[in-house]
Amino acid sequence: MGVSRVLYVEGGTPLKGELRVYPAKNAALPILAASLLTPEPITLVEVPRLRDVEVMLELLAHLGTQYAWEGRTLHLQTPEIKSTHAPYELVGQMRASFIVWGALLARAGEGHVSMPGGCAFGFRPVDQHIKALEAL
């Protein structure tokens, strides 16, 4: 049997109170893509109104999502997948657009998504995404 390591922390004052969590694009984009998985209405609060979020919403609308902003609250629903083809004009604008592929496969049984575009911020391969989808 191995030796287990334990870290004991003797604190002073217990933590209590509230913490405001600010919206982040990198959290919002996968949640938006996941909205394709259900026909039910979804409400997201404190969604950042950034270019990548707007491009993702354009892509989702092309695929069948209806959405409406109410301040920083976003209401969306995808009653049906109207297209399984993500147009390159949108996919090419943003790296995160690639993540709609899994949701399309799960909900519609197929998905056609070009290799993602976006910024040239270093080397960011998508091979792990492809391997995961091939394993389905």
Please identify what each model-predicted range represents.
Residues 1-136:
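Structural preference for solvent-exposed beta-strand-turn elements
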